Design a protein with these regions (language model features):
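Non-heme di-metal
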Residues: 1-142, 147-152
């Protein structure tokens, strides 16, 4: 089936997004000290590379990642924590899924790809354990206790 230029461009955008996310996850995995979290991020990266290869079957093009996006999410993840960075990145991907409807007629297996990607990545992201988040939760609870004590003293 011959793809229109508009559909082909959308597929190239999807493909570029997958290879960019692959590099983001790989970069984060290398920078994380916890072996279990690094392993999970490596697994997500390999999934993204597989999705890139799936899109490449239709576009027949090798694409380079968006280096600016890699650095942006890497820095966000280093400053605010990798869990925050990953969830921010994945929230952007949810809006891209609306565009999948426009190419559904050309790519019959797209529904399976979306389902697999959502289930697998969400399961893996939920497994991530970040010490910084646990610490932040303790700080919030401590501040809450202090506020209760302060209002009780008044």
């Amino acid at each position: 089936m011959e793809l229109s230029e508009e559909v082909r461009q959308q597929l190239l955008d999807f493909q570029k997004n997958e290879i960019t996310e692959y590099h983001i996850y790989k970069k984060l995995a290398k920078s994380i000290k916890e072996a279990e979290n690094a392993k999970i991020l490596d697994q997500i990266a390999e999934d993204e590379l597989g999705h890139y290869e799936d899109w490449k079957k239709y576009t027949n093009e090798e694409l380079k990642p968006n280096k600016w996006t890699i650095w942006k999410y890497y820095l966000i993840s280093r400053v605010f924590g990798f869990t925050f960075g990953i969830k921010l990145m994945e929230s952007g991907e949810k809006s891209a899924q609306v565009n999948y409807d426009q190419v559904r007629e050309y790519i019959p297996e797209i529904d399976n790809w979306i389902k697999d990607e959502n289930e697998h990545e969400n399961a893996l992201i939920e497994m991530l354990d970040e010490e910084r988040l646990q610490y932040a939760g303790s700080v919030v609870l401590g501040l809450n206790d202090a506020l209760v004590e302060l209002t009780g003293a008044l």
